[in-house]
A protein has these predicted regions:
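Short, Lys/Arg-enriched N-terminal segments with co-localized hydrophobic residues
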Residues: 1-12
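Alpha-helical hydrophobic/aromatic positions enriched in membrane-embedded helices and signal peptides
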Residues: 11, 57, 142-144
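Core catalytic region of metal-dependent phosphoesterases/phosphodiesterases
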Residues: 15-18, 22-117
Length: 159
């Protein structure tokens, strides 16, 4: 379980991110056209931005597709990323099948999770879920009480 931000370990931020696709050259060149001259330049830029924002004590919930890299490349990357990492496994996270990654760099690796964050229920999945647990719950002000966070969709839902 992911602890509530600001409890248990002192003050920290929790970030949610998806579809970084480290080491995915075609994503840079053809699919998302990220505009970097090389995959190495893309990786270096994302790593620099990540570590400029995320402190070592912060938590990062990754909603899948962290890395398209080989196991050794991904392991090196993981050791350079700041933060306590939680992984919702995506369809491109091939490295998760390698038991070498079931080590303390990830607090956990799962396909689905429900947690509390800032007094809200959060549903986590790499894929969008049309009807998710608690989606119709409202608080006394009529505001949503449950949020679905997902990745996978890079452009529009109809793709």
């Amino acid at each position: 379980m992911v602890p509530e931000a600001g409890t248990n370990r002192g003050e920290f931020m929790r970030y949610y991110i998806s579809d970084c696709h480290f080491f995915h050259g075609e994503l840079n060149d053809k699919m998302d056209c990220r505009g970097f001259d090389s995959t190495e330049e893309m990786n270096a830029y994302m790593l620099k931005k990540w570590n400029a924002k995320v402190r070592p004590n912060d938590e990062v919930v990754i909603l899948g597709d962290l890395s398209w890299g080989k196991p050794d490349e991904t392991k090196e990357l993981l050791n350079r990323l700041n933060g306590r990492l939680y992984l919702i496994i995506g369809n491109h996270d091939r490295f998760h099948e390698n038991n070498a990654y079931r080590y303390d760099r990830f607090v956990w690796m799962k396909h689905y999770e429900e947690l509390k964050d800032n007094k809200r229920k959060i549903i986590l999945s790499h894929y969008p879920i049309m009807c998710y647990n608690g989606q119709y719950y409202r608080n006394e002000k009529g505001e949503e009480k449950t949020y679905m966070l997902y990745g996978h969709v890079h452009d529009t839902m109809d793709q």
